[in-house]
From Swiss-Prot:
Homodimer. It is an enzyme of class 1 (oxidoreductase). PANTHER family: FMN-DEPENDENT NADH-AZOREDUCTASE 1, FMN-DEPENDENT NADH:QUINONE OXIDOREDUCTASE. Its EC number is 1.6.5.-, 1.7.1.17. It comes from Xanthomonas euvesicatoria pv. vesicatoria (strain 85-10) (Xanthomonas campestris pv. vesicatoria). This is FMN-dependent NADH:quinone oxidoreductase 1. Quinone reductase that provides resistance to thiol-specific stress caused by electrophilic quinones. Also exhibits azoreductase activity. Catalyzes the reductive cleavage of the azo bond in aromatic azo compounds to the corresponding amines. Its cofactor is FMN. It catalyses: 2 a quinone + NADH + H(+) = 2 a 1,4-benzosemiquinone + NAD(+); N,N-dimethyl-1,4-phenylenediamine + anthranilate + 2 NAD(+) = 2-(4-dimethylaminophenyl)diazenylbenzoate + 2 NADH + 2 H(+). The keyword Flavoprotein applies.
């Protein structure tokens, strides 16, 4: 099994999202000891945003880099995405990655019956820290967007691990992280006993 681990938080060692995504990957390693993990830090090694030049792919090095991103995605069976909520949505570095994998003829196609995803059969686990509380979905453009774009690519096995309200106070941050990690542990226990 191949697992692609992406982090997109700009907070480095202070990132709750990075702690959560690492915990999800570790959980997958325990469940599947043979897993082959690839890691990409979209903050430290950002993918260029789409421009007229990157779309034209006139630079052979740029075209090769874009193809490497695509192949890494296509070869993954499981994708763990560290996606913090920034201003109600996702980091622009993660959006740049999505723009490189959402390619007509590669991960989706247009048919007489409408668009059809070509990247099905993958499992995506999204680890996310949010500064506030988003029980009211009208302010959450992150989760619906990720579900929509991944679904458009044919991926329907999508789950979220969330720590909310991490900006409220240090205690709330610690409690939210502990709760999210405990939820992972409960999920793991359920999987083992099933």
């Amino acid at each position: 099994m191949k697992l692609l681990h992406l982090d997109s938080s700009a907070l480095g060692a202070n990132s709750v999202t990075r702690v959560l995504s690492a915990a999800v990957v570790e959980q997958q390693r325990r469940r599947h000891p043979e897993v082959d993990v690839s890691y990409r830090d979209l903050d430290r090694d950002p993918i260029p945003h789409l421009t007229a030049q990157t779309l034209a792919q006139t630079d052979p090095a740029e075209a090769a880099a874009a193809e490497a991103v695509m192949q890494q995605f296509l070869q993954a069976d499981v994708i763990v995405i560290g996606a913090p909520m920034y201003n109600f949505a996702i980091p622009s570095t993660l959006k740049a990655w999505i723009d490189r994998i959402a390619v007509a003829g590669r991960t989706f196609q247009y048919t007489a019956n409408g668009p059809e995803g070509l990247a099905g059969g993958k499992r995506v686990i999204i680890a996310s820290a949010r500064g506030g509380l988003y029980a009211d979905p009208t302010n959450d453009f992150q989760e619906p967007y990720l579900r929509q774009v991944l679904g458009f690519l044919g991926i329907d096995d999508i789950s979220f691990v969330r720590a909310e309200g991490v900006a409220y106070s240090p205690q709330h941050r610690a409690d939210a992280l502990a709760s999210a990690l405990a939820g992972l542990g409960e999920e793991e226990e359920a999987a083992v006993s099933a």
